[in-house]
Amino acid sequence: MASNNVAQFAAELKMPAGVLLEQLQAAGVQKASEDDALSETDKARLLDHLRKSHGATDGDKRKITLTRRHTSEIKQADATGKARTIQVEVRKKRTFVKRDDVSETGADQAHAQTDEQAEAELKRREEEARREAELLEKQAQELRERQERLEREEAERRAREEAAEAERRRAEEEAAAKRAAAAQAEAAQQAAAAREQAQRAQSEPAEQSAQDEARAAAERAAQREAAKKAEDAAREAADKARAEQEEIRKRREAAEAEARAIREMMNTPRRAQVKAVEPPKPAEPPAAKTAEAKGTLHKPAKPAGEAAAARPAAKKPASGAPAPAAAPAGDRTKKPGTGKSGWQDDAAKRRGIKTRGDSSGGVDRGWRGGPKGRGKHQDSASSFQAPTEPIVREVHVPETISVADLAHKMSIKASEVIKVMMKMGQMVTINQVLDQETAMIVVEELGHRALAAKLDDPEALLVEGEIGSDAEQLPRPPVVTVMGHVDHGKTSLLDYIRRAKVAAGEAGGITQHIGAYHVETPRGVVTFLDTPGHEAFTAMRARGAKATDIVILVVAADDGVMPQTKEAISHAKAGGVPIVVAINKIDKPEANPDRVKQELVAEGVVPEEYGGDSPFVPVSAKTGAGIDDLLENVLLQAEVLELKAPVESPAKGIVIEAKLDKGKGPVATVLVQSGTLSRGDVVLAGTAYGRVRAMLDENGKPTKEAGPSIPVEIQGLSEVPGAGEEVIVLPDERKAREIALFRQGKFRDVKLAKQQAAKLESMLEQMGEGEVQNLPLIIKADVQGSQEALVQSLLKLSTDEVRVQIVHSAVGGISESDVNLATASKAVIIGFNTRADAQARKLAEANGIDIRYYNIIYDAVDEVKAAMSGMLAPEKREVVTGMVEVRQVFKVPKVGTVAGCMVTDGVVKRSSSVRVLRNNVVIFTGELDSLKRFKDDVKEVKQGFECGMSLKNFNDIVEGDQFEVFEVTEVARTL
């Protein structure tokens, strides 16, 4: 089919139309769609582009010589009857010359040369064919002579056997006749004797008659016995003669069948004849080449119909035809008319036999046979596979996947994936874990479609709605989070509401934990979450906003809107939580509530009196003014929200804070959001699971159950859960353990994959930056929120020259393992509201490990910052100490040039450095070699005095030069 457009041409080439369009555009042929017409010129340009892109040059070979050597075997019997194998080797050589159309003369010469070569090649091949035909004719003549000799010998042998058989039969007949004559003679004698006795008996007396009768009876019995023996002997001789005749007949039939098979084999047309040489033909389609390759020198390829008909005939004889008789001569005979010689069958059976120059037995080989083409031999059963369109697969890529699994999903070898990764700049192995993003890039690079797979994990077993559809939704208390800038009075405000003194117990008077409390008011229960206001506790404030229903934004009337105030507003807006503004410290003389309102309006928090939806309540945590109005507004907002949650259902909640207690183990503060949490329930929180062994309220009193919006402290988890993790109650501990272990493995795989992905980038960064100072730290904190905040604050201190390296961070006391880790990594241990035990302190003293304790996050950050400043390389500064004018120059042997100078400004010291200025241009910078006044060496010369000076490695001093004397000082740097 003629290809008139891009789609038809792509179908003809068996390739996607999109790939063909890209190749056409790369070749400079502008085609926009698959329906665009395609001319022969466009095809020629595409072909030229593809040849150039695959490295084709104008210096291609103009002449190709193909040599073919074909070795085959024939098998025949020699004069002694033994089978011999004769090797027949046919060598063919063909030269293809590419004509050059550059000039007419060159073309004619090439044409003439090609004709001469073709003629010489034709003559040579005809000579080879003639010699081969003579050889085959000679072999056939020898075979015919051998066959005639065998036939003559067989005829002579049969004649001798027939003569011997006739002689033997004649001898047997003569012997039988003699035995019969002897028996008849004996019977006649006995009869004559009996007659004589009868005659004598007539003359003898009567008393002898009984005796004579008995004797006659005995003689008759003996006569019958002799006749029976003679008859048996004659029958036995006849049977033996018939058996011998049957055996002779069988041998004769076998010999005739063998001779007939030999005659048929000789009459079969020879397939070894070499065909006449033909001019080179154009390349045939692959299918035609395959069909030709299936024929061999002695076994030409049969048509499909004939081959199909021959297969069932070989398995079972045709109905009605007699089964072939078993030939005694090794079953080498065949039915007439098969047209196949015994040589061919024997050669086929001996395919595995190696011959000189041919490892395949010389049978069933293609064009690339021979010693150099042994690896190219193909089995005749294989067939050519036409090129097919590449298969584009949809590969579902999970969060992490190994290289081997990714290759298996694409049905390719892992080495192909490794090659692509090497091109992308990553050296990987088949067992290396890739993250999802990298794996999807590799899949798309290999031409497949990458899809982010859904996790096939045990968490899918969790019913989406653990809460039953029939669970009754009941009103629940609101969860109120108090947020604001540090030192704006959030905790003091809560203290007044709770009638407690929490702020006084916090180190430094600032909140460093999330506090969860519930307060009973005349209008109902309210749960408060107190969040830190320090800038380091961003993640902690985000968790507070996530779990809350209403936000109380505390702003000091004397301070106004600060950075953490803005951050709290953004957290509340991101969670869609209504804001109630409490303007605190109105009892101070410098309080300015109106300025606070204006600043909050600029941040998008508009008071109700200005037409907004945020109530503003002026309060004082010190005097208690406005507290009732604040609670009234909070409960009013809760009524508007219509907060409800099921009570009679498995509990769900969120981890507000978690820590490792030395006596209690992992302890988590949980805010129940729905359902009822009871003591003894099996809970799952992230990678931690366990049974609730004890449950305490915010005052430390034991409680048996907690309903919605009630904060409790639970014990019994397997490890410290992450703050902000979701808590869920499961029916049995086995399912909780299974899901927790799966999450741990997934977290580890994701972490390793991300580390591997970032390894190359970090390596290149370190190479580019050169030497970077590292400050290794091990951080242990009392609760996870404080640990997170401290780690983030310290990591922000890193610069291009000094970097904070967090070797390990965890919750709990400082143990011996932490000290051993610090010894190995040369790290400093920071304990935030934790202490080291006795064994850890002793080990730290023995190894010289520095352990620092802090209760306030300010102090920890400031001291680490000071330590990093000490690690910075000092800054070098030049300080000019004096100016010197050269008045006279002296040449001193073995010393060099000495300048007689006058100190015009400042002071010149022996250890100072010098710049030489000529016409106010620096021509040399170096050091003083000597400083003398008169003949004495001096340490310094002050302004207004003369001196002699010589410089190291510089003698080009002239009168009128100026020396600028300076010193280099090092100045400590700070972050």
From Swiss-Prot:
Biased composition (Low complexity): 178-211, 302-330
Ligand binding (GTP): 484-491, 530-534, 584-587
The keyword Repeat is assigned to this record: no
G5, as annotated region: 620-622
InterPro entries the record matches: DNA-bd_dom_put_sf (IPR009061), EF-G-like_DII (IPR053905), EFTu-like_2 (IPR004161), IF2_assoc_dom_bac (IPR013575), IF2_II (IPR044145), IF2_N (IPR006847), P-loop_NTPase (IPR027417), Small_GTP-bd (IPR005225)
Example GO molecular function: guanosine tetraphosphate binding
Gly residues bias: start-end ranges: 359-372
Keyword DNA-binding belongs to the record: no
Region listing for G1, in residue ranges: 484-491
GO CC annotation: cytosol
Residue intervals of the tr-type G domain: 475-644
Residue span of region G3: 530-533
Localization, UniProt: Cytoplasm
Residue span of region G4: 584-587
Region feature (G2): 509-513
Keyword terms, alphabetized: Cytoplasm, GTP-binding, Initiation factor, Nucleotide-binding, Protein biosynthesis
Region (Disordered): 48-85, 98-390
Coiled-coil blocks: none
Recorded superkingdom: Bacteria
Biased composition annotated in UniProt, kind: Basic and acidic residues: 48-63, 120-177, 212-263
Family: Belongs to the TRAFAC class translation factor GTPase superfamily. Classic translation factor GTPase family. IF-2 subfamily.
Function: One of the essential components for the initiation of protein synthesis. Protects formylmethionyl-tRNA from spontaneous hydrolysis and promotes its binding to the 30S ribosomal subunits. Also involved in the hydrolysis of GTP during the formation of the 70S ribosomal complex.
Name of the featured protein: Translation initiation factor IF-2
Organism of derivation: Burkholderia pseudomallei (strain 1106a)
Highest classification ranks of the organism: Bacteria, Pseudomonadati, Pseudomonadota, Betaproteobacteria, Burkholderiales
Gene symbol of the encoding locus: infB
